[in-house]
From Swiss-Prot:
One of its GO terms (cellular component) is cytoplasm. Pathway: Purine metabolism; AMP biosynthesis via de novo pathway; AMP from IMP: step 1/2. Disulfide bonds: none annotated. Binds 1 Mg(2+) ion per subunit. Keywords: Cytoplasm, GTP-binding, Ligase, Magnesium, Metal-binding, Nucleotide-binding, Purine biosynthesis. This is Adenylosuccinate synthetase. The gene is purA. Substrate binds at residues 298-304. Its cofactor is Mg(2+). One of its GO terms (molecular function) is magnesium ion binding. It is an enzyme of class 6 (ligase). IMP binds at residues 13-16, 38-41, 128, 142, 223, 238, 302. HAMAP family: Adenylosucc_synth.
Length: 427
């Protein structure tokens, strides 16, 4: 069986956890392929709410194997806390597999992330301060420490000593911060190694064998397309590639294994942190969207910026990811609005632009051009069939499909596992 990719089509927080959980019943493996604990998924099952930061949502399905791929950067302390929290709630975490090639977030990464962000002042990017960027930086610089190094204490110490020789100079002499002691870190990470050792595997090999046996593999990205370090609103992006092109690399499988790419897209738009946001609403309407939609970060608790649906970035996401389907989430949040605007293009210096601007300067100056559709008053939270949606809601969905260039195959009308309308089977 081929693999499928599930990615965010906006600035993250689109509802990927809900989508992954829905598909989890039809897949055998769920693989997280990039990012770290700087993003979170929320899954609601009955009265239970699960906030996941590193572990794939497939952990909540008893017959699914969750995998943390080589493209992820891992804070082992955070991972163990998450595992313990799930275990305390009766979730079997013994199935979790961790790629030996994934990189470790170290104390010096967190320290440097926090201090450099403060140093930037008003020019800061809005990092979560969890060490994600510095870890990816060391990975590319070939000075990182990988999960497999936990299995060899001698190699781990040697790599750590080499890293701290430089990092402590920067912390102490540039930022006037305390040096990090090698022995303290070695002791801390030795405890992590003891607990995580049984979960470490050659996950690329595991997944290849699974695919050859006809198993279904779901590749789950974190964050979203517009936060991609190459294709996002740079420099206000994450330090990895959430887009579909990286899914194979970050999971350790060949790209020809993938035959479907599903983009999760919210019925309106949100983003966290600094950076351009053409449809942002700095008024009571924006506050209302935030309140009704519960737009506060799972990981940071920060209030998300809110705005109307932006068809320009939707088209862009379809293009750069090769999206075959859209999973539209939070349609229920738009109930009660008399009119629902959709951004169909940008005004940049008096010129209309219908595609993503080539430069970030142009994107920064983009002003939305709206078309307005009639809204609907009905509560959608109990709707379970597409045919039962209000006519205005159906018109809204059809318009989004036409403007984005991809079909809507599933619709979320609430946070619950059962609050999803499936139009086309995704697996």
């Amino acid at each position: 069986m081929p693999a499928l990719v599930l990615i965010g089509a906006q600035w993250g927080d689109e509802g990927k956890g809900k989508a992954t959980d829905l598909l989890g019943g039809a897949v055998d493996y769920v693989v997280r392929y990039q990012g770290g604990n700087n993003a979170g998924h929320t899954v609601v099952i009955g009265e239970e709410r699960y906030a996941l930061h590193l572990i794939p949502s497939g952990i909540l399905r008893a017959d699914c194997v969750p995998v943390i791929g080589n493209g992820v950067v891992i804070d082992p302390g955070v991972l163990l806390t998450e595992m313990d929290g799930l275990a305390a709630r009766g979730i079997d975490v013994s199935r979790l597999l961790i790629s030996a090639n994934a990189h470790l977030i170290m104390p010096h990464h967190r320290a440097l992330d926090r201090v450099t962000e403060r140093y930037l002042g008003k020019a800061r990017i809005g990092t979560t301060g969890r060490g994600i960027g510095p870890t990816y930086g060391d990975k590319v610089a070939r000075t990182g420490i990988r999960v497999q190094d936990l299995l060899d204490p001698g190699i781990f110490r040697k790599k750590l000593e080499l890293a701290l020789r430089e990092k402590n100079q920067v912390l102490a002499k540039v930022y006037n911060r305390r040096r990090i002691e090698v022995d303290e870190v070695v002791e801390e990470y030795a405890a992590y190694a003891e607990r995580l050792g049984p979960h470490i595997a050659d996950t690329g090999l595991v997944l290849d064998r699974a695919l050859r046996e006809g198993k279904v593999v779901l590749l789950e990205g974190s964050q979203g397309t517009l936060l991609d370090v190459d294709h996002g609103s740079y420099p206000f992006v994450t330090s990895s590639n959430p887009t579909a092109g990286y899914a194979a690399t970050g999971a350790g499988i060949g790209p020809t294994r993938i035959n479907r790419v599903v983009g999760i897209i919210k019925a309106y738009t949100t983003r966290v942190g600094a950076g351009p946001f053409p449809t942002e609403l700095d008024d009571k309407v924006g506050e209302e969207l935030r309140r009704i939609g519960g737009e506060f970060g799972v990981t940071t608790g920060r209030a998300r910026r809110t705005g109307w649906f932006d068809a320009v970035i939707a088209r862009y996401a379809v293009r750069v990811n090769g999206l075959t389907d859209l999973f539209l989430t939070k349609l229920d949040v738009l109930s009660g609005f008399d009119r629902v605007p959709i951004c169909v293009g940008y005004d940049i210096g008096g010129e209309r632009v219908d595609e993503m601007p080539m430069t970030q300067t142009e994107f920064h100056h983009a002003r939305p051009i709206y078309t307005e559709l009639p809204g609907w008053q009905e509560d959608l939270s109990d709707v379970r069939k597409y045919a039962d949606l209000p006519a205005a809601a159906k018109d809204y969905i059809r318009t989004l499909e036409e403007l984005s260039g991809a079909p809507v195959s599933a619709i979320g009308v609430g946070p619950g596992r059962d609050q999803t309308l499936v139009i086309n089977d995704l697996v």
